Design a protein with these regions (language model features):
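Short acidic/polar inter-strand loop motif in beta-rich domains
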Residues: 58, 116-123, 233-239
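Beta-strand-rich domain onsets/edges
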Residues: 28-48, 124-183, 189-193, 243-260
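Short, acidic Ser/Thr/Gly-rich low-complexity loop/linker segments typical of extracellular
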Residues: 194-212
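Short flexible loop/turn segments that cap and initiate beta-strands
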Residues: 61-70, 178-185
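Bacterial N-terminal signal peptides
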Residues: 12-24
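Aromatic sugar-binding surface patches on proteins
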Residues: 88-98, 211-214
Length: 260
């Protein structure tokens, strides 16, 4: 991912110019994908959730996930810690996580994860992407705009489920609960293999929020869409070699569109 418009970002780009020609541009997205975004009466109430750190539009590669710091849900019964339900899965030597959750009552369920910091040597940053997804259950339609209280978070201004292809998604980028003027937001579609981007700029869409931190994007294809608000962290973190390095903080939300 990128941190647009910061001196630190510009400096890192200058240092990485030698690699840029050889390595295609690729945005990191923390995925948190449920089996469905809407649970209906008579439907399956047991939700499978997949947590993967990857490049969704390019269908990989998958990056190795450390054990998440926290994983939970904010629902009609309040907040619950779901970290004990996580199961680590490995493919091609890279770790991802899965979990199951039993929906028991009507309401909206905001699933969220704080992943372990990820070291990206190509950009010289530690990456922490606070990610959430909202599932509506049994037609209640209440609670979809609840905020978790993550350090960086997108508050939806449009109900983030029950969306048709072409609908406009709007949200507010917040840091520590306050809107972030002119925040950078990256958008990617979770590619099912049916689309080959004609050039790198088509892989990741880039939005600049307005002075109130509000952004909007019309989703042109059915499937899962990831919105990632990217900010520079206030404090450095140590990389695997113990050196303090900048931090990319992300607030992500996933929404799904369906064809009419």
């Amino acid at each position: 991912m990128t941190l647009h418009g910061t001196p630190a970002r510009a400096a890192r780009l200058a240092l990485a110019l030698g690699l840029a020609a050889a390595i295609p541009a690729a945005a990191h997205f923390q995925e948190l994908i449920p089996a469905t975004e809407v649970v209906t009466a008579g439907g399956e109430a047991r939700l499978a959730l997949a947590l993967t750190f990857t490049h969704p539009m390019e269908r990989g590669p998958v990056m190795d996930m450390g054990e998440p710091v926290r994983f939970g849900v904010l629902g009609p019964a309040g907040r619950a810690d779901l970290k004990p339900s996580l199961k680590r899965v490995e493919a091609n030597g890279k770790s991802s996580y899965q979990a199951d959750y039993q929906v028991q009552q009507p309401g909206d369920y905001v699933f969220f994860v704080e992943p372990a910091p990820y070291w990206e040597p190509g950009e010289g940053v530690m990456i922490v992407h606070y990610t959430k997804v909202v599932v509506g259950a049994f037609g209640a339609g209440e609670g979809w705009d609840a905020t978790v209280g993550l350090p960086v978070e997108i508050e939806p201004l449009v109900r983030p489920y029950g969306l048709w292809t072409g609908n406009l998604f709007r949200g507010i980028v917040k840091k520590d609960g306050k809107p972030v003027p002119f925040a950078a937001v990256e958008v990617e579609w979770r590619n099912d293999g049916s689309v080959k981007p004609p050039a790198d700029p088509f892989v990741t869409q880039v939005i600049k929020a307005d002075g109130n931190g509000v952004f909007s994007y019309a989703m042109p294809r059915a499937g899962w869409w990831g919105f990632a608000a990217l900010l520079e962290g206030d404090r450095p973190l140590a990389n695997p070699q113990g050196k303090p390095v900048p931090v990319e903080l992300g607030g992500l939300i996933w929404v799904r569109t369906r064809d009419m």
